[in-house]
Structures are given as structure tokens and as C-alpha cells.
Regions:
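Short, solvent-exposed loop/turn segments at secondary-structure boundaries
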Residues: 41-45, 249-252, 319-322
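Conserved Rossmann-like nucleotide-cofactor binding loop
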Residues: 14, 37, 161
């Protein structure tokens, strides 16, 4: 059984980091993803990596660590040691109310980070998990294309809409939060930004004290950042959100969504108002219903050699940027508890004990992040609650005892 592979379901951040660790230590594995290719999905998101950076450096081979700058949304700012202020603004007055401190953090393109993490990794694409079959010492993943793969451990890294989680816990439902979000990404020139690039090289956020409509702004790329970057324009992500209590339905038509964004932000101060009002008429506006979910300790399932990791274990709101950081440390916790290089680690009794310890580590660390992220989401849409909220609090690693 020592040659039996680790099965990784999902080639997101945690799945690829785990794959890199296993490859570095010559441990057999297979990694599968439901997408047709790494760039199958359009649209860009940025990730802020802070308290997970030591774990990430420990897990990855040095030659990938040295290539981190290939993922930066603003290499120039990062090179000069600028970690950003991550300010929170009163969108009526334009005043900066809070800075979010961090000893160390980098802002990366999720797409570029995934590209880096696939280096020398053979991802099997177009693999939609259909079912799982278990015996005492093996676990088999069956895919919709009729193929299957058997291993000694299955690690579910298949995200917020985890098929693995559905199989393990068929009665579980995501928690819908009373918040609606509209988001778009576009290219703006420095002139169109109106000085926004001087506020922060990475991200900022804010809310209007009367309407309680929230703004999240981030740079996804900057001029001349990479060879394929725009020479004179900034790639920007613009998100606005509001509470369901405002009873504002989201229209289906894209043009009507842009019109709604303009209406909701019409009383914002500059330059924040123009960030929304200058959106091109043909930009795609995505509607997202905010949801979260957190696994519970001690919940039994039929597949003891399967374990959840990353968003499949703890789907968090985006309002503290802690999901990816927890996912990375999940990997370190797993390989700390399960000695992947030692065949006896996969004996049934030893593995069950190690996975229970891993789940306890994850729950102890991630539950506070999960709860803080939920509270930050709710507070973002009630200006009176922002003072002292996790929305503007520091981000730090909670270590297990």
C-alpha cells in the first residue's frame, strides 16, 4: 500500500500546495480538477497572503518561493517593501477611518499563483467527482467520465461548492447571509482613476454612513507589471454590496445591474463615486449571494480515509481575506499530523487518529476566522458597527494548543 497515491480532489490553492509538498518529498499522488484547464474560468480575483506566508514558504520548494514575485499584482510596490495600508473610508466624507496593520503581507493574483503552483504538476483536468467508495485500507474516487482512481487517502480541496463535502455530508447546506453583492473588473487609465492609485497600491474599502452600501476595491494588475500587462492601464476590481434589509432586488440584465450600481453609489464622495460610474457599458457585472459554512468536529461519515481542506472545510466570506490563508495552513497541519513519507502513518488506526488531530487543529484555528469573517460581512453593511469590528481588525494566526 506504500505506493498507493494520495488523491487530491481540486486544483485550487490548497490542492496545489499539497501536491507541491508531496512531489518535493517523493510521495505518490494524483490531483484532479473538474475544470477543463487551469484558465477555463474567466474573471480575476486577488488574494492577500499574510499570516500564512511562513507556512507557504515551509511547504513549497525553494525554487517556487523565489518566484513569488511572478504572482504579485504590483511588483514595484512589493519590491520597495510597501505592504499597503488597506484603509477603510467613510464614503460620504471621503475620510480614511482605519488602517489594517500587518507585519508582512503580499497581494497576489489568484490566477497567477495557481499557474505558479502547477509548475511540474500533472493535473488531470475534466474530472468531475461522482462518488466515493471505501474499504478498510483504500479509498476510490469515481468520476463522471467513467474513470476511477484508488488511493490511501483522499483530500478534498474542491472549494466552496465541494462535491466531496456533498458526498460525506449529504444533509449539509450552505448558510446564506443577508447580503447581496455585485462585482466587476475593468481597465482604467491613471486619468480615469483620478488619483486612486495613490491611496493604496493594493486594496481599500469603505461604506456610506447613511446608505450602508459597502465598497471593496482592489488592483488585479498594474501597468507594465508583466509582459502581458497593459502598458498604461490598471486592471481594477470593483465590488459593492448591501444588506437584504434594503429590499433591493438584483436585476438579471447586465445593463440594469450597472444602472443599479450607479444609483446605489450616486451619493458617494470622489474619487470613489467615479470608480463605479466610469464602468464601461459592456463590462460584465457578476451577482454573488454571500454564503458560508464550517465543518463540525465529531461528525461521522462513511469514508474515514477522506478529509476536507480549504474552502471545502471552511467557506468564509471575503470580508477579512482569511480563506486562502487558512487553506494554506490546513496543508501544513495535515502534513504535520500525517507523516506522508512513513507508510505506517496510513495504517487504519494511525490514520484515523492523525486525521482527528488534524481536524481539531483546523477547527481550533479556522472557526475564529470563520466567525470573524461572518461578523465582518454583517458589520460592513451597518456603519454604526464598524468601530471595533473584525472588518477593520488585525489579521493574525491563531495557533492551536
Amino acid at each position: 500500500m506504500s505506493d498507493s497515491p494520495i488523491l487530491i480532489i481540486g486544483a485550487g490553492i490548497s490542492g496545489l500546495v499539497l501536491a507541491q509538498y508531496l512531489q518535493r518529498h517523493n510521495v505518490a499522488f494524483k490531483i484532479f480538477d473538474r475544470d477543463s484547464a487551469i484558465d477555463a474560468r474567466s474573471g480575476g480575483w486577488g488574494l492577500t497572503l499574510h499570516w500564512s506566508l511562513p507556512a507557504l514558504r515551509e511547504l513549497l520548494p525553494e525554487h517556487l518561493v523565489t518566484r513569488f514575485p511572478e504572482t504579485f499584482v504590483n511588483k514595484e510596490a512589493s519590491a520597495r517593501g510597501d505592504t499597503g495600508r488597506f484603509q477603510f473610508f467613510d464614503l460620504r466624507s471621503g475620510d480614511a477611518l482605519y488602517n489594517i496593520p500587518a507585519a508582512e503581507r503580499i497581494r497576489v493574483s489568484r490566477a497567477r499563483l495557481r499557474q505558479l503552483l502547477t509548475t511540474d504538476i500533472d493535473v488531470q483536468w475534466n474530472k468531475n467527482l461522482q462518488s466515493i467508495e471505501s474499504t478498510a485500507d483504500k479509498i476510490t474516487a469515481h468520476f463522471q467520465d467513467g474513470t476511477s482512481s484508488t488511493g490511501r487517502l483522499l483530500v478534498a480541496c474542491d472549494g466552496a461548492r465541494s462535491r466531496t463535502r456533498e458526498i460525506l455530508y449529504p444533509d449539509v447546506q450552505m448558510n446564506q447571509l443577508p447580503v447581496q453583492l455585485l462585482g466587476a473588473s475593468t481597465l482604467y487609465s491613471a486619468e480615469e482613476l483620478g488619483g486612486v492609485e495613490s491611496i493604496d497600491p493594493f486594496i481599500f474599502q469603505g461604506s456610506h454612513p447613511e446608505s450602508n452600501v459597502f465598497l471593496f476595491f482592489s488592483f488585479l494588475d498594474t501597468p507594465n507589471n508583466f509582459e502581458n500587462s497593459s502598458k498604461d492601464r490598471y486592471h481594477c476590481q470593483i465590488i459593492i454590496s448591501w444588506a437584504d434589509s434594503k429590499e433591493i432586488p438584483v436585476p438579471d440584465a447586465n445593463a440594469e445591474r450597472i444602472a443599479l450600481m450607479n444609483k446605489l453609489t450616486d451619493n458617494w464622495s470622489e474619487p470613489f463615486r467615479s470608480l463605479v460610474h466610469k464602468l464601461p457599458g459592456d463590462v460584465e457585472v457578476r451577482s454573488i449571494r454571500i454564503e458560508d459554512w464550517m465543518f463540525r468536529l465529531g461528525r461521522e461519515h462513511a469514508h474515514p480515509r477522506a478529509v476536507l481542506m480549504g474552502d471545502s472545510a471552511h467557506t468564509m466570506t471575503m470580508f477579512r481575506g482569511e480563506g486562502a490563508n487558512n487553506a494554506i495552513v490546513d496543508v501544513l497541519d495535515l502534513v504535520t499530523r500525517v507523516d506522508m513519507c512513513q507508510p505506517s502513518s496510513f495504517d487504519s488506526g494511525a490514520l484515523l487518529s492523525s486525521l482527528a488531530a488534524y481536524e481539531n487543529d483546523v477547527f481550533t484555528r479556522a472557526e475564529p476566522s470563520f466567525l470573524n469573517s461572518r461578523q465582518a460581512c454583517l458589520d460592513a453593511h451597518d456603519f454604526s458597527k464598524i468601530e471595533g469590528s473584525p472588518l477593520v481588525g488585525s489579521r493574525e494566526l491563531k495557533k492551536s494548543d
